[in-house]
Amino acid sequence: MPGQRKLGRATDQRKAILKNLTTALFVSGRIETTEARAKEVKNIAEKLITLAIKEADNFTSKQVKVSAAKVDSKGKKLTDTKTSKNGKKYFVVEREQKTDMVSVDNASRLHARRLIMNWVYRPTTADGKNINITDKLFDEIAPKYKDKKGGYTRIYKLGPRRGDAAEMVILELV
């Protein structure tokens, strides 16, 4: 008996379906799908959440020098006029140096982040902004379940789907 359900699809199609469903679950918190797909997504989501919980606090902070363009009150870059050796004038963007505190992942957290990225897509909002699911897992979802040991998702049965009578369910984060 195989370790995972085949879902009547080729391997690449099956993985794409599971990635889409897993991403949708983490973005919206709940999905409506068939029972077989929900059981597979539940296994994947539980493992990813457990991984995020274990590695949630495994990072360090360090100071980094950052160079950025100076901007005026309207948000436009400030420029300065310079003269070249040949006597031609050109514009140079004025820059400012500052130091920022940046969090840097340790090796095990970086590995966990890459494993999570294997199972989710990079969705966008209606405005076109990217949603970073790995950051959402580490910063929002993992702290919520920090004291729990499993059981992060639940399945509600809805009944058969009209047309092919497939058993429909709602999979949601608890």
UniProtKB/Swiss-Prot annotation:
GO terms for cellular component: cytosolic large ribosomal subunit. One of its GO terms (molecular function) is structural constituent of ribosome. The keyword Hydrolase does not apply. One of its GO terms (biological process) is translation. Gene3D superfamilies: Ribosomal protein L17. It comes from the Bacteria. Keywords: Ribonucleoprotein, Ribosomal protein. Disulfide bonds: none annotated. Belongs to the bacterial ribosomal protein bL17 family. PANTHER family: LARGE RIBOSOMAL SUBUNIT PROTEIN BL17M, RIBOSOMAL PROTEIN L17. Part of the 50S ribosomal subunit. Contacts protein L32. This is Large ribosomal subunit protein bL17.
